[in-house]
């Protein structure tokens, strides 16, 4: 889905920037990342889900700083590609979104080696989004 369709569908709306909300969201993202880091690798689904939540919240902050509210995770991909001009990050986020959905909704299992690689990629993604914020 592209930004035009996201806006037409009501999944992206113009908003005024709310500094207090941004501060609260940044704290929430940090707590989720810390919670993920505190879990042992045996809780891999939870670690990945928490990191995904953290990075999605950081994307929400980035969108708010661009006066946008995004109501659909797929539209964050379009936001990264079309508004932020970071196509690679958009593709990477979409992979994380699909993996998280597969783990949470379809019972996908992931081996430890693959999980460790995903966690590293997610942490690098979070670092990059923080740099953009």
Regions found by a protein language model. Give the residues of each.
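Terminal alpha-helical segments
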Residues: 1-133
């Amino acid at each position: 889905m592209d930004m035009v369709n996201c806006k037409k569908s009501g999944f992206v709306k113009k908003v005024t920037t709310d500094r207090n909300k941004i501060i609260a969201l940044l704290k929430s993202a940090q707590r989720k990342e810390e919670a993920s880091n505190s879990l042992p690798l045996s809780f891999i689904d939870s670690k990945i889900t928490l990191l995904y939540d953290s990075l999605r919240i950081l994307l929400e902050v980035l969108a708010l700083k661009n006066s946008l509210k995004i109501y659909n995770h797929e539209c964050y991909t379009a936001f990264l590609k079309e508004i932020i001009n970071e196509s690679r990050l958009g593709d990477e986020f979409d992979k994380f979104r699909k993996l998280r959905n597969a783990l949470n909704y379809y019972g996908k299992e992931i081996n430890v080696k693959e999980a460790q690689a995903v966690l590293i990629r997610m942490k690098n993604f979070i670092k990059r989004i923080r740099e953009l914020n």
